[in-house]
Swiss-Prot record:
GO molecular function, one term: nucleic acid binding
Cofactor note: Binds 1 Mg(2+) ion per subunit. May bind a second metal ion at a regulatory site, or after substrate binding.
Cofactor(s), names only, from the UniProt record: Mg(2+)
Location in or out of the cell: Cytoplasm
Enzyme class, UniProt record, top EC level: hydrolase
Protein name: Ribonuclease H
UniProt keywords, alphabetically: Cytoplasm, Endonuclease, Hydrolase, Magnesium, Metal-binding, Nuclease
Transmembrane regions listed in the UniProt entry: none
Native source organism of the sequence: Cupriavidus metallidurans (strain ATCC 43123 / DSM 2839 / NBRC 102507 / CH34)
UniProt-listed HAMAP family: RNase_H
Length: 145
């Protein structure tokens, strides 16, 4: 299987407000940049969209390393989702899971791949995540024009 590295980020001007997502995919010396935007939305929805759209861009099953500065995404997909699914998309205190539509989409998008999730501190000079951040901000700008 091909190895792919994904750097993802989301941005929101106001929360909720206009938002954008960005992702950089790196594989075999090739790079692809993706971005988009929505309004109104939240930063967490944009963080999720970045990863979902990056995974949807992969044409075949891959070994994937995903770098995100969102602990919400990293912990949600690695730890919390198992309980949510077991409880019918409810939290431990029986409330509906926020952004369940996107968590379900991410759960589906990750299925064909072998994924390792990595959390990186945001705005800390990590080149891949800085690029993803710039793309997310382009996503915000794309809906403000």
């Amino acid at each position: 299987m091909q190895e792919v590295t994904i750097y993802s980020d989301g941005a929101c001007k106001g929360n909720p407000g206009p938002g954008g997502w960005g992702a950089v995919l790196v594989a075999g010396g090739h790079e692809k940049e993706l971005f988009g935007g929505e309004s109104p939305t939240t930063n967490n929805r944009m963080e999720l969209m970045a990863v979902i759209e990056a995974l949807r861009a992969l044409k075949r099953p891959c070994i994937v390393n995903i770098y995100t500065d969102s602990q919400y995404v990293q912990k949600g997909i690695s730890e919390w989702i198992h309980g949510w699914k077991a409880r019918g998309w409810k939290t431990a205190d029986k409330k509906p899971v926020k952004n369940a539509d996107l968590w379900q989409a991410l759960d589906e998008a990750q299925k064909p791949h072998q994924i390792t999730w990595h959390w990186v501190r945001g705005h800390n000079g990590h080149p891949g995540n800085e690029r993803a951040d710039a793309l997310a901000n382009r996503g915000v700008a794309s809906i403000n024009t």
